[in-house]
Amino acid sequence: MTLKTIEGTFIAPKGRYALVVGRFNSFVVESLVSGAVDALVRHGVSESDITIIRAPGAFEIPLVAQKVAQQGAYDAIIALGAVIRGGTPHFEYVAGECTKGLAQVSMEFGVPVAFGVLTVDSIEQAIERSGTKAGNKGAEAALSALEMVSLLAQLEAK
């Protein structure tokens, strides 16, 4: 018996991508944005099909993503931001609510929401994950969005 496998590809179908970006910790976040845009363009997405929407911080990203998803104008949303642990419980609240909110948007609207929000213990970890030795999590989120758009298109065609 041959098992059938359905999986997404990184070939960019015609589609529009919204990058919802938290401005807080911008010294890290801008590297994530550059990585995401570069990955999308390298995989065939036209720059005219990429929109960057800036929110104040990670906590606000889910609401902005929800409004974007409601519009129905984008095939995927790529959430980018950075939450760096400090000396108070603030980190847990912001990171947790951002994560839950983005998952809820994806499930409620059926739009892929790729998670590129860094939740790290230190500035050093944030820098490592935004383009140095740990790669660029913005680029990884963009690839995840491409793959999900492709996968969902295949599932909807069945």
From Swiss-Prot:
Disulfide bridge map: none
Cell inner membrane is among the record's keywords: no
UniProt GO cellular component terms: cytosol; riboflavin synthase complex
Enzyme Commission code: 2.5.1.78
Keyword Methyltransferase: no
Reactions catalysed, as given in the entry: (2S)-2-hydroxy-3-oxobutyl phosphate + 5-amino-6-(D-ribitylamino)uracil = 6,7-dimethyl-8-(1-D-ribityl)lumazine + phosphate + 2 H2O + H(+)
UniProt keywords, alphabetically: Riboflavin biosynthesis, Transferase
Gene Ontology biological process terms from the UniProt entry: riboflavin biosynthetic process
PANTHER family noted in UniProt: 6,7-DIMETHYL-8-RIBITYLLUMAZINE SYNTHASE, 6,7-DIMETHYL-8-RIBITYLLUMAZINE SYNTHASE DMRL SYNTHASE LUMAZINE SYNTHASE
Protein name: 6,7-dimethyl-8-ribityllumazine synthase
Upper lineage: Bacteria, Pseudomonadati, Pseudomonadota, Gammaproteobacteria, Pseudomonadales
